[in-house]
Curated annotation (Swiss-Prot):
InterPro entries reported in the protein's UniProt record: Atg5, ATG5_HBR, Atg5_HR, ATG5_UblA, Atg5_UblA_dom_sf, ATG5_UblB
Cross-link named Glycyl lysine isopeptide (Lys-Gly) (interchain with G-Cter in ATG12), sites: K148
Membrane topology field: Peripheral membrane protein
Organism field: Candida albicans (strain SC5314 / ATCC MYA-2876)
Gene3D superfamilies, sorted: 3.10.20.620, Autophagy protein Apg5, helix rich domain (1.10.246.190), Phosphatidylinositol 3-kinase Catalytic Subunit, Chain A, domain 1 (3.10.20.90)
Record's protein name: Autophagy protein 5
Compartment list: Preautophagosomal structure membrane
Protein family membership: Belongs to the ATG5 family.
Free-text description of this protein's post-translational modifications in UniProt: Conjugated to ATG12; which is essential for autophagy.
Any one Gene Ontology cellular component term annotated for this protein: autophagosome
Alphabetical keyword list: Autophagy, Isopeptide bond, Membrane, Protein transport, Transport, Ubl conjugation
Length: 278
């Protein structure tokens, strides 16, 4: 295919893609800021420990490490089990495309009054002994479940990941957290024995609608969007653009979803597509 050359180099660039984020915390009507750069294909809980350490310097009434924190954008809790880049494309990129002067993504950190369990997955595990929230344990459980789901779609069975040795399972998790591309690729190949169908999730910016479906590996991106989002993918809806990993992939409409998945899949082996109306 002409549009996707130098696959390894492109994958490396995607792996190293990052987003500038400004985290705000309102403490007694005083706004405290924290700036960071976070990889697109990582997850927000990986930076929770450093947020807690920083903001604890300004809080004396509570131990932040012992209460679950969460992040919000425009008062909407962020689903932390989604990759950072997917959240960015779905929630923030549409506004940025219309106003290039918006700057970095600004979101708020919360720790009270009540964790919004009706919107986002709660953190129920705690570290033994000191009562601190164990964010990594919960994230491990959720991401491994997502990998099992994608493994089932890809292989027609979840056996490849279920049959990983304990050592390989732990190494896979460490490669996700440390973002070791080499180790991740080696271990991920053990999960993907065959490619039966492609695990795809389609998000529509500005809408709560999410389309999740196993897709035939031979279908094109255009065929998939026409089938699952016909109102946004018809010729009369030419202003709807598909974004993957922050990139407008309109030029790849006639490529097979398998080729696109091989290039753009996330750490959980799902292909996340965001439709943005421009």
């Amino acid at each position: 295919m002409n549009d996707i050359d130098n696959l390894a180099e492109i994958k490396k660039k995607l792996w190293n893609g990052s987003i500038n984020v400004k985290i705000l915390l309102n403490i007694e009507d005083q706004i405290i800021e924290y700036l960071l750069t976070i990889p697109r294909n990582s997850y927000f809980p990986t930076v929770f420990p450093q947020l807690i350490r920083y903001f604890q310097n300004f809080i004396t009434t509570i131990e932040l490490s012992k209460v679950p924190i969460w992040l919000e954008f425009e008062e909407v809790p962020l689903k932390w089990n989604l990759p950072v880049g997917v959240l960015y494309d779905y929630l923030y990129l549409p506004a940025l495309l219309n106003d290039h002067d918006l700057g970095c993504w600004t979101i708020s950190m919360k720790y009270e009054p009540v964790y919004p369990i009706e919107y986002i997955i709660p953190f129920n595990e705690k570290l033994a002994g000191d009562g601190q929230i164990d964010y990594m344990k919960t994230m491990n459980r959720i991401l491994m479940n997502q990998l099992k789901q994608s493994c089932f779609v890809l292989n027609g069975t979840a056996k490849p990941i279920m049959q990983l040795s304990e050592a390989n399972t732990n190494q896979l998790w460490k490669s996700l957290i440390s973002r070791n591309l080499g180790d991740f690729n080696v271990l991920n190949k053990k999960i993907i024995k065959t490619i039966d169908r492609i695990p795809v999730k389609i998000y529509i910016a500005g809408s709560p609608i999410v389309v999740q479906a196993p897709i035939s590996k031979d279908q094109t991106l255009q065929e998939i969007l026409s089938l699952h989002t016909p109102n946004l993918s018809s010729s009369s809806s030419s202003m709807s653009h598909p974004y993957i990993q922050g990139i407008d992939v309109t030029s790849l409409m006639n490529q097979s979803i398998r080729e696109i998945w091989q290039l753009f899949k996330h750490l959980d082996n799902f292909l996340y597509i965001t439709l943005i109306i421009l």
